[in-house]
Amino acid sequence: MITSELPVLQDSTNETTAHSDAGSELEETEVKGKRKRGRPGRPPSTNKKPRKSPGEKSRIEAGIRGAGRGRANGHPQQNGEGEPVTLFEVVKLGKSAMQSVVDDWIESYKQDRDIALLDLINFFIQCSGCRGTVRIEMFRNMQNAEIIRKMTEEFDEDSGDYPLTMPGPQWKKFRSNFCEFIGVLIRQCQYSIIYDEYMMDTVISLLTGLSDSQVRAFRHTSTLAAMKLMTALVNVALNLSIHQDNTQRQYEAERNKMIGKRANERLELLLQKRKELQENQDEIENMMNSIFKGIFVHRYRDAIAEIRAICIEEIGVWMKMYSDAFLNDSYLKYVGWTLHDRQGEVRLKCLKALQSLYTNRELFPKLELFTNRFKDRIVSMTLDKEYDVAVEAIRLVTLILHGSEEALSNEDCENVYHLVYSAHRPVAVAAGEFLHKKLFSRHDPQAEEALAKRRGRNSPNGNLIRMLVLFFLESELHEHAAYLVDSLWESSQELLKDWECMTELLLEEPVQGEEAMSDRQESALIELMVCTIRQAAEAHPPVGRGTGKRVLTAKERKTQIDDRNKLTEHFIITLPMLLSKYSADAEKVANLLQIPQYFDLEIYSTGRMEKHLDALLKQIKFVVEKHVESDVLEACSKTYSILCSEEYTIQNRVDIARSQLIDEFVDRFNHSVEDLLQEGEEADDDDIYNVLSTLKRLTSFHNAHDLTKWDLFGNCYRLLKTGIEHGAMPEQIVVQALQCSHYSILWQLVKITDGSPSKEDLLVLRKTVKSFLAVCQQCLSNVNTPVKEQAFMLLCDLLMIFSHQLMTGGREGLQPLVFNPDTGLQSELLSFVMDHVFIDQDEENQSMEGDEEDEANKIEALHKRRNLLAAFSKLIIYDIVDMHAAADIFKHYMKYYNDYGDIIKETLSKTRQIDKIQCAKTLILSLQQLFNELVQEQGPNLDRTSAHVSGIKELARRFALTFGLDQIKTREAVATLHKDGIEFAFKYQNQKGQEYPPPNLAFLEVLSEFSSKLLRQDKKTVHSYLEKFLTEQMMERREDVWLPLISYRNSLVTGGEDDRMSVNSGSSSSKTSSVRNKKGRPPLHKKRVEDESLDNTWLNRTDTMIQTPGPLPAPQLTSTVLRENSRPMGDQIQEPESEHGSEPDFLHNPQMQISWLGQPKLEDLNRKDRTGMNYMKVRTGVRHAVRGLMEEDAEPIFEDVMMSSRSQLEDMNEEFEDTMVIDLPPSRNRRERAELRPDFFDSAAIIEDDSGFGMPMF
């Protein structure tokens, strides 16, 4: 009996009004007319159906025939009039109102309950996707288990889908209709039919049996039905409880009347009504008890995540709907345990269920023990690897904070605080909401009302802004102010837009008794203020958050315009004052100068505010003259560029001010250069500083402004030539002169490309570029590293800009400006990369120790080296530098993988797209270089087991993996690689005689790593080519020094069948792993092999480039555990060592000439192909027959297994290991709590009860 464990169902004092469908009271006629129940405490039978009388047989058979005419697996069958004939069809189509459908069924039940019940049984069977139909003989003579076993045999084994999992809007609608049908059915039957001890016993017994099936479709569908059935029963129980309370109050009121006014008949009637309600409630509790213990406690830990999620979602509904009965530790423990589920969707349902409870503050006392027990787990879930779960966990923690601030410790809050800096915006916004609730919510209404009358620094926002600044400084993430502002934007927008208060805090002196802001606090406030201005003006998240700019709605657009006007009108006046106050502080000025780019500059004219523009220009000029820091100068230059925009009327005024400023600096620069060059080595520090400071300012302005009319290139070139010839020029001057000259050349190129240049203009620019490239090349040998790095970067940039691509887009007239680097320059660039990028870690550490630089400087140095490598790699990718130069880069792939692995891999991928053959030659060349270096270090007698040899072999293995799975596509490239490798191995003869191995013979062991990428017929051809270099003596040798040759030969003559199958897999598409494939589609590899031209030679191949076709998307990884593919298995087999290459897949081109002759005849090839395919079809059929639809429910099943490399498998294992298990470990504080009350959350109790729990639930 439920009543023993849930006294609240008996003693409920809930005074909430009843639901509209139940009414305030039960009709007396319904109470009196209800038939007597035999054994109200008897749970429904789960084994045997009630027997039917012989007289009912014909009627039942007629009903079964009517109910069974529809097909189950989603294909409706209609009668002659086009109307659906089964409940399944009616619910699936959803054309009729659900209440009318249920009313029709109830009417049928009243006429003949067996026919109606059988229709309902077949409804659940068909909703599971089963083709079978329960017949009268089965219904009468077989137990539930036998019926379910019979229905299991009727499933369509070719498909793993069933209505609840089928895609498409129709089936999504079906799920909602299915749930609605169950709810309406119980609601309409709640006054009579559900108490007849027949309907509910039969339905619950069937659903209990189906939920214990090994067939996923049965288990999933019946669990959903049972949980929705339970939810409807909970609603009925709640209504009964309310009616009981009302009846009890009426009875007490009548009994308390004076004897003369008391109506005894009414007292008896109320007493009888109360008794009937209690009996009904006992009956409902028995039903809920059967569903909960028979279904929920087993299925909430089902192997299928969707089933577990259904259980948790519904128990949350029960606890919220009927909190007096269900919101206690006996039920909450299931949600708490499932917080550790390994699947994110289940954890998400747990959090959603808890959110609905914590939203109601009246329920907090009942949640106190649960909060104490699972608070740590909930807080830790804010760092969940699935962002959706993390967001909901943060929202739940916010609700807990809102209900009781004492529930969370300072440490718990700090764990959420730092998430405002998360790159994932929903997580950050949720954390911002938490931060707003904790720090910025005002809780004193009187103080708020008093402060609301004040404005500026004394307004309510004044203290909150100070608090925000302190939080920002304490977080020690000062480069992420934009992220902090974005996180708080939705919850604290009013505070963040109070720019008046911010500027008053910065400009006004503190009043007496008020603590002044420190320099750090002022800098932080300025940075935050600029970020709020950007957020308001642009109305989209900062870089790194979100996928890009979205289209604003009309309301958002209006808000953006209003905010932009508001900030413009305010800062047009206050910005000059802020610049004046903080003009000496470079960091503050650089931030303040970001503000004008967000102005609506039209307001200067429309608002008659030109005087404020003059004040701003005056302050900017003062800042330029005062500072030489690059950040400040670039900010000033950008501000001038924005104010000079041609679409605004203020452009002329700003252009005049800018020209005057540039004139002054150019005159000063020309005079200081003359003084410096005249004095030569005798120049003092003042002369050097004058040149350097002025040149820095001009370089910063030249970046954003066309200063070619001032001819800065001439003096810069003079400084560079003097530095090269005499070597006494300071490195900073050289660096700035190089950069300024570079900008000058680019602006000249812009003029030429935008206009109609004459031949003379082209020749002048060509001469300028040629002379500057020569200077940069000479600077590569400079003793100062910054000079060399700057020269290298500018060389790479200019070679890219003035390459053959300059003529694309109809600009053939610019051909005189194209520069192709000669061999000497290419060698110098490559040597620079080798010397400055691929440096040993020890050398780097020593240099860092000598300069006393910290970890941040190491990261900065690595960033510079990565830029150098990327600049040179672009020259290779765009065919400006010969591809063979990449060999020196590829050979460092393993050693410097952590630092440059992504750059090198991308370079390899792009070069392969340019020319597969040449790329393969480059790869083998890089391995040959490493081998030669090793021979020079250790001599010709290499130790094959040494780490150096193993490293080369590992690098070769990695290179082999990059060729991908499609061996036909890479066939000629791999063949060429083997050809070059063999020639290298036998290039030199041993000076001691032919009986000794060639010096490079050990290289064959490295080459054998690529043998798995050869086709079967190509292995024979390569073997034949190898034998041309072998003598009879070599073939007979078995000494250790000849083992590389033996190993390589073995790799070419073994594995034929495996390679044959790998060809098939390489030609298959990504659709081979799908659940269902189109019938009759021929295997792709057969078609390709038949179309292949196999009569071309490879031995005499020339090195002509073969352009590859365009890329196609790489095949997707799909699940193959539970749902086998109906296509031949030959299309799915892949080599164990293969992985998806970095190169995208290409369409096979039958016209491409494939070399390597000596292949088997085409007829023999096709015959073996057909034999292999027939065998695979047999294997596939056997797998389908054995597989069936059975599943074990002991452990969750992971389906994603098509991983193609060891690293991917390791990543998958790590992902599974760090997910959460369902069961909690024993609590550390269980002993203390056990003295006070039982610990309902102890997951160790799971093993103590056959139902899964150590304590009786009911």
Swiss-Prot record:
The keyword Chloroplast does not apply. GO terms for molecular function: chromatin binding. Residues 1-84, 1055-1096, 1129-1148 are annotated as: Disordered. Residues 1076-1087 have a biased composition (Basic residues). There is a cross-link at K1161 (Glycyl lysine isopeptide (Lys-Gly) (interchain with G-Cter in SUMO2)). Residues 53-62, 1137-1146 have a biased composition (Basic and acidic residues). Keywords: Cell cycle, Cell division, Centromere, Chromosome, Chromosome partition, Disease variant, Intellectual disability, Isopeptide bond, Mitosis, Nucleus, Phosphoprotein, Ubl conjugation. SUPFAM superfamilies: ARM repeat. Cohesin complexes are composed of a heterodimer between a SMC1 protein (SMC1A or SMC1B) and SMC3, which are attached via their hinge domain, and RAD21 which link them at their heads, and one STAG protein (STAG1, STAG2 or STAG3). In cohesin complexes, STAG1 is mutually exclusive with STAG2 and STAG3. Interacts directly with RAD21 in cohesin complex. The cohesin complex interacts with the cohesin loading complex subunits NIPBL/Scc2 (via HEAT repeats) and MAU2/Scc4. NIPBL directly contacts all members of the complex, RAD21, SMC1A/B, SMC3 and STAG1. PANTHER family: COHESIN SUBUNIT SA-1 (PTHR11199:SF6), STROMAL ANTIGEN (PTHR11199). This is Cohesin subunit SA-1.
